[in-house]
Design a protein with these regions (language model features):
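Conserved N-terminal Rossmann-fold NAD(P)-binding element of oxidoreductases
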Residues: 3-7
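A short helix->loop->beta-strand "cap" motif at the edges of active sites that frequently abuts
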Residues: 24, 82-85, 106-108
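Rossmann-fold cofactor-recognition segment
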Residues: 41-51
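Beta-loop-alpha module in the N-terminal Rossmann-like domain of NAD(P)-dependent dehydrogenases
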Residues: 62-79, 92-96
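Rossmann-fold NAD(P)-binding glycine/threonine-rich loop
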Residues: 89-112
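Rossmann-like dinucleotide-binding core of oxidoreductases
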Residues: 109-170
Length: 170
């Protein structure tokens, strides 16, 4: 299976890592900058979603976007047009609604807003349940970057671990 991961920041790296752990996939990455040496990808392209060749996506069985939210619609519409399953990390409810409406009208598969949590954390919890010898009745999940030691430092007065893109946050 050929999987494309667009955006190779922190979340893109994590997605590529998990794909390596979960299966034998051929992983393509695409970003507007060169890949760093820690990225475990099979192929990397430096590209701009807005200037992508019309048929570039056709070799992929799945496209995952870890791009900033304002680029998701552009990529999603191209995937929808080519009937390539698409998912993203979200970041904007109006963008996700636009993507979902387009997918419904063209009967294409999309999953939007699969960010850290809810989203990726839920997927990993389900995978853990599938691999446990006895399945518990409930899973309790917490999300947040707040450390247990809440004493602020001069370096970071909020003492908060930023695990997601703040693009579009007001």
């Amino acid at each position: 299976m050929n999987i494309a991961v667009f955006g190779t920041g922190q979340m893109g790296h994590a997605i590529v890592y998990m794909l390596r752990q979960l299966g034998n996939y051929t992983i393509y990455t695409c970003d507007n900058r060169a890949a760093d040496s820690n990225l475990m990808t099979d192929y990397h392209s430096v590209c701009d979603v807005k200037d992508m060749e019309h048929d570039y996506l056709q070799k992929f069985d799945l496209v995952i976007s870890s791009l900033p939210y304002y680029l998701n619609n552009e990529l999603a519409q191209k995937c929808i047009e080519h009937k390539i399953p698409y998912c993203d990390l979200g970041g904007s409810v109006p963008v996700s609604k636009t993507i979902n409406q387009s997918a419904k009208s063209l009967k294409s598969t999309v999953f939007t807003d699969l960010g850290l949590a809810p989203g990726w954390a839920n997927i990993m919890a389900e995978q853990a349940l599938l691999e446990l010898p006895s399945v518990p009745h409930t899973v309790k999940m917490r999300c947040g970057g707040l450390p247990s030691d809440i004493a602020p430092s001069n370096k970071d007065p909020f003492n908060y671990k930023l695990t997601w893109s703040i693009d579009g946050l007001y």
